[in-house]
């Protein structure tokens, strides 16, 4: 009987913690997506980066909007920062390929990577 009660208690706690984490992810996605829709990419960067690091498989919008955010950062940054953002964009495309392979053809990623490296060599 104690094992059953303990098991039920453990399940309840784990479901509760999972739903809280999921709510945080939903809120972060909502926050940065609204900033991106308003083209306020600088404000969107921090919540986007937190969600990308915490839950990379949560939603493909992390990668779609992330590409816009990083392209904005590349255009509006110094030479030092630009190189870091370019490398981050290349990494973002690889992460998208790993986490959402059905939505990311390899040819598209390779073509985008080559074009980006050519444009900013």
Indicate residue ranges for each PLM-predicted region:
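N-terminal leader/linker segments that initiate helical-solenoid repeat arrays
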Residues: 18-87, 91, 102-108
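Extended amphipathic alpha-helical interaction segments
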Residues: 109-121
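Sec-dependent N-terminal signal peptides
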Residues: 4-13
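Short, intrinsically disordered, charge-balanced linker/junction segments flanking boundaries
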Residues: 15-19, 120-121
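Positively charged n-region of N-terminal signal peptides that target proteins for export
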Residues: 1-4, 19
């Amino acid at each position: 009987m104690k094992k059953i009660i303990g098991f039920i208690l453990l399940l309840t706690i784990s479901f509760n913690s999972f739903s809280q984490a999921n709510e945080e992810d939903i809120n972060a996605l909502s926050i940065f997506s609204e900033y991106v829709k308003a083209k306020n990419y600088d404000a969107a960067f921090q919540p986007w980066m937190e969600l990308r690091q915490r839950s990379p498989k949560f939603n493909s919008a992390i990668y779609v909007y992330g590409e816009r955010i990083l392209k904005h950062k590349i255009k509006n940054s110094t030479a030092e920062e630009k190189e870091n953002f370019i490398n981050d964009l290349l990494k973002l495309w690889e992460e998208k390929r790993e986490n959402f392979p059905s939505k990311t053809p390899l040819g598209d990623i390779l073509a985008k990577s080559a074009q980006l490296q050519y444009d900013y060599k």
